Amino acid sequence: MKRAILIVILLPFIATVNCFAFKSDLPTDTILSRAMSAAEKYNELVENYTAEVYVRSYVETIRKNFLYKYTHLIPDFVLHDPENEDAVIETISDLRYEYPNTYVQDIRHVTGTLTKKKDIDLIPFELLNINIYGETTNDESFFMPIRFSTAKYYRYTLYQSFTSNNKEYYNIHFVPIYENPKLLKGSFIVEKGTWRVIFFRGEGLDIFSDFSFEMTMGDEWVTNYLPVNITIYQTAAYLGNVLAGRHLASINYKEIALRQFQQPKGSLNISNSYKVRLDSVPLHSDTLFWEKIRPIPLQAREIDVIERYHQQQITRENQRKTNDSLGNNRMAQHMAQRMVVNSSYRYKSARFGYSGLLNPLMLGYSSRDGITYRQKFSFMADLKRSRNIKVNAFAGYMFRRKEFFTDLTTTFNYEPLRLGSATFSLGIGNPTYSSLFVDQIRDKLENQGISFDDISLNYYKDYYFKLFNTFEATNGLLFQTGVDYHIRKSKNNVTMLRSLTLNGDPIGQLFGTKRSFAPYIQVIWTPEQYYRFEGRQKIYARSYYPTFKVEFSRSLLDVLGSTSQYNRIELDISQKIDFGLMHSFQYHIGVGKFINQETEYFADFVYFSKNNFPENWDDGLGGNFNLLSRSLYNASDSYLQGHIMLESPFLILKNIPFISDFADKERLYLSQLHTPQIKSYSELGYGIGNRFFNAGLFAAFHKTRFEEIGVRAAFEL
């Protein structure tokens, strides 16, 4: 079917009376060089436009088995009709574009046999906004082939030269030099002289599917550099089931403004880089309306599908009046789905989210900590002037250590324009031990049978309460002030020690309930911080400069029963540096110290702590130590740490079949730690990942001595 469509599209060029093939008088390299030079100019040609977009989606089940009926339980997976072999959806939307990559698509009308929001969300609208002259797609999913910077990833062949209406054209085929989800294969036709692309076809791979898209550019001067017709094919294959989809799009431009090529005014506001807006489905079922406005006539098969759907609707309505069992079955399926997937609900101005009790994405694994399991719940109530109240609840369990963690955080976002918020948080944190305990064990009992490695981290269980306020003084500069209150309770289980003092004196006085009341101030500064707005809510995006964090805390003795008095100061610097295409380098440097310790204290740092359920950086693995023993996080009153991560789509796996098909990111890790006790601890790592999961292999070294090797995996939502 794909080949047939391609022939139909090319037919006007090869069937014209004045159309004939000829041998090109230009080398392929020259044609490519001129086309790529023109692409750099055409990429920045359009300043803005508005358009009406018609999209018709037809999906068909090619092959299925008994597992097919459970496909709808997988969220955001594949567009299909669980009750029929095929389905049709039609949409009309308004598309607005602003240079360089701001797309806002408002869906105005929807009709067809699948009209739920979850079905509309699976239509690949993002492929309609591909700029064939760009280096990458807007979401950086693919490297486009018509640029000098991406040419090193492709091989090109001049397939055909021909003339039509006294114009010469070149049909160029391209293939990737190795398999990778970031690379396409396909062809494009360029016009000699203007060197613009008149037709583009690309094919790509995903984990469970493959797809192709065809773009035909306009034939009027104002649309010569913009697509007017797009066809997208998708095929999903999983567990013996095969589903195919075809999406036809027609774009009718209303207004187009070209750029004046003047120096743009600098702005850090990058709101709405790409957004499809569909708060509720604007269902419009008037047959006469669609017959009048539909730019692409329905095919016979599509007419049959729609007529069958209308007949089924009548039958269902009759059944509903006489039997409620059908509704009960659907309710049971709905409940089962919510058990295994991340789900969200909306009621008036309130939104709820739940991770799903049996959701496999809530599982994690590391060779040191074993299997971890977590649950998340969220609630947000919208108020006037874009204000809101958010509640996030978290619970996690580590099976190997039999430890339970919780957190309940409530935030009142009272000034969204200035990131003003007040937050209250409480929960159960990492088990820990006090400085008094460590000092006495290490300094006084070292010769009596207890070594540092014998300490059990279950001596103190940490219950924390945190109240703080955050406010933006100016763009990129945030101030946070608050109070940390900890209650640390020991299990008073002295037998957990592997030995006692020689004279049998108990050391129970080292245990009990300890409290700390610590006001703190935190300053976060990012120079030239880019941001965007969603309504009145300001959201930080990126910056070309590092982010600096400074935090100072002082624990006050005898306030709310506090037994500690100390000062803590920490400095943290982090940055993500993008270079090349989809390559990045991230670093994170931190230093901290407890000073003026006048009493017993717990060496719990903010930026150097055990994260049992990591969500650092973009991969869930980097930015922390993956193999470091948790006993060493609290073993010193100071630390100096550094982490770096290099990410690229092409490192080691690019020439390995199968693996390179699904792993579109590779990462190298290096972490270094220095404390007065550890001196030098290092971790080296290598990781792979995609949008579903990330996994890494790490090796640990103490000074120059190899310690251990381990793995860690994190799943993406």
Q: How would you label these PLM feature ranges?
A:
Residues 55-63, 234-241, 254-264, 427-435, ...:
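Short, conserved secondary-structure transition motifs
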